[in-house]
Amino acid sequence: MKKFEEFDLSIEVLQGIRKMGYQNPTKIQEQAIPLILQKQDVIGLAQTGTGKTLAFASGMLSNLTFNYDKIIKGVILSPTRELVIQIENEIKKIGVFTSLFFNFLDFFGM
């Protein structure tokens, strides 16, 4: 199993991951993070609690940290308000040491 330091994640994102208490990536993280860092689209399927949010967010935030210019660079869509809140909380933890600005919106109803 790899270590998070073996990925080309930004130092700030690695600090956030360490603060969260994670040592080793899960299988979905091992597979997804390198592709996301290469700015490839990824569709991943894994059970609840396996770290999918950390997988996509760590790569996305690292890419944004490396190329920060204060314009919108990332959009995450979620099917439920509850999942938006969960993703928001995780991204704030992962990105706590970055200088990135996060804005979360939820739109629901038709």
Show the residue positions of the predicted features:
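Generic secondary-structure boundary/loop-capping signal
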Residues: 1-4, 51, 58, 80
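Conserved pre-motif I regulatory segment
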Residues: 1-45
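The conserved Walker
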Residues: 46-50
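Short, well-ordered helical secondary-structure segments
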Residues: 15, 24, 51, 64-65
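Conserved nucleic-acid-binding Ia/Ib motif block in the N-terminal RecA-like helicase ATPase lobe
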Residues: 6, 11-22, 69-110
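Walker A/P-loop NTP-binding motif
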Residues: 30-42, 53-69, 85, 90-94
